[in-house]
Amino acid sequence: MAHFAEINENNEVIRVIVVSNDELLDENGDEQESLGATFCNTLFGGTWKQTSYNGNIRKNYAGIGFTYDSTRDAFIPPKPFASWVLSEQTCQWEPPVPMPADEYFYVWNEETTSWDQVNV
């Protein structure tokens, strides 16, 4: 099964649907994203981009609220905190300070731009 994300005029993902792989096959039996996008457009209208759970296309699996960046050809999740920066390699948001790698649990504190240990 193939997955397609509908993006609005602001390049925000507004829904993701599943499409049979048969809808993507050309006359030679090769999958073509454009055929799947046309199929989705015929059914629902709008603009559609293929997405993948394994991240082999467009960096991340699209979710509602994600943004499609045409320059990076990637789906980018919503920014969780103002201080976090986008990794160009993964198109995931990363904290300005890495989370400690020890046996404790942490939550991000945006006020101090640091990790706070959580007592469990």
Locations of the language-model features?
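Interaction-interface detector
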Residues: 1-120
